[in-house]
Amino acid sequence: METGRQRDASAEMFPMPRGLKYSNKDGIPEDLDGNLEEPRDQESELRSQDVMDLTEGDNEASASTPPSAKRQKTDTKGKKERKPTMDAEEAQRMTTLFSAMSEEQLSRYEVCRRSAFPKARIAALMQSITGRSVSENTAIAMAGIAKVFVGEVVEEALDVCEMWGETPPLQPKHLREAVRRLKPKGILPNSNYKKIMF
């Protein structure tokens, strides 16, 4: 029988690779003693049987395909399943909303949906302001925020144009008035901020 001290000594002389463990019987790693011991429980037997069935099916289906392509194939299937789908209630709500829109609103919505700020220019602008490099994720987030901001300003400018009884090609005066109206709402920061001394 091996004492704890002898086992430590043998472990120091012959280090085991990570992930391998000693078996309870004779110190042979569990991963390597498949022929020496019988399976301990039926779960491991079922798992190995399932694995064998899966690998046999893969070998029969595509024997000439390299293993990396098989892995990529299964990864893409998993990603497709995880993609969130729109439920029926949400789809009904969207169709109701689209049917209520006028042609002008629908075309404006489509243009707004397709538009985007160039990420490279946003990143360059942010880098010139901060003096540090900007990650791609930060540039993408800032481009999204800028798109929302422009949408709010344009929507407010259209409201101003309608209130003044003018037709929709927006003019600079409409945009200026929209920005002036958005400042008190807290959407725009105050650019003329003066530090109060006392």
From Swiss-Prot:
A GO CC annotation given for this chain: transcription factor TFIID complex
Xref: Pfam families: TAFII28
Tissue: Expressed in fetal brain and testis.
Signal peptide span: none
CDD domains in the cross-refs: HFD_TAF11
Entry superkingdom: Eukaryota
A GO BP annotation: RNA polymerase II preinitiation complex assembly
Region Disordered: start-end pairs: 1-90
GO molecular function: protein heterodimerization activity
Biased composition (Basic and acidic residues): 1-10, 37-50, 72-90
Stored InterPro entries: Histone-fold, TAF11-like, TAFII28_dom
UniProt record similarity statement: Belongs to the TAF11 family.
Protein name listed in UniProt: TATA-box-binding protein-associated factor 11-like protein 11
Species name: Homo sapiens (Human)
Lineage: Eukaryota, Metazoa, Chordata, Craniata, Vertebrata
Gene name per UniProt: TAF11L11
